[in-house]
Amino acid sequence: MKKAVIAVVFLAAGLWGAYGHPHVFMDTRIEAVYDGEGLRGFWITWRFDKVFTAGILMDFDGDKNERLSASEIAVIEDRAFSNLVNYRYFLYIHSAEGQYRPSSVESFTAYMEGGRVHYRFFVPYALAIGREEVKVNIAVYDETFFCDIGYFDSAPLLLPASDTFSGEYAIREDRGIHIDYTANDGSPGSTFPRQIALTLRRER
């Protein structure tokens, strides 16, 4: 098996947990969506590393043009994305309503940009915003550390322009969660997932 496609095979087969150090590297961007009552959900964008990108193109870019057609995207969704429902798409959302881990997502697509494959999908998450501030914490991580998931350096969270709602966010480590792993040289290590702490309010 060619090295470039190993990550794709693991994604499709669901073999996380057998390895103690990352095999897939990805950055996340989160875009909040409002409706008339408050928060409607989040668009999630993942940007993958070059090795994973090469595997996706090798296995699923049938015409080898480094662009993904609708039919190719459908196969990617089926064979290299749908299994992630078993990991709740690596998403942990906390608010006063409790913890939410999505069991389904909507509007999946995949595309190439800057030489990297990107996944994009929508996570419905309805939360009313009234007179009091609403706080939502969003974390994206793989507790097995097969995937090393970070955030975009530029604009990791996007808030839509709105005359009704406003908000701000900060990114911080969640010291309550400890992920142990084994480095490539065999030495032990540990890390803490980073979460986006989002505060939303109604302006009128």
Region spans (language model):
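A short beta-turn/strand-edge loop motif at beta-sheet boundaries
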Residues: 38, 85, 128-132
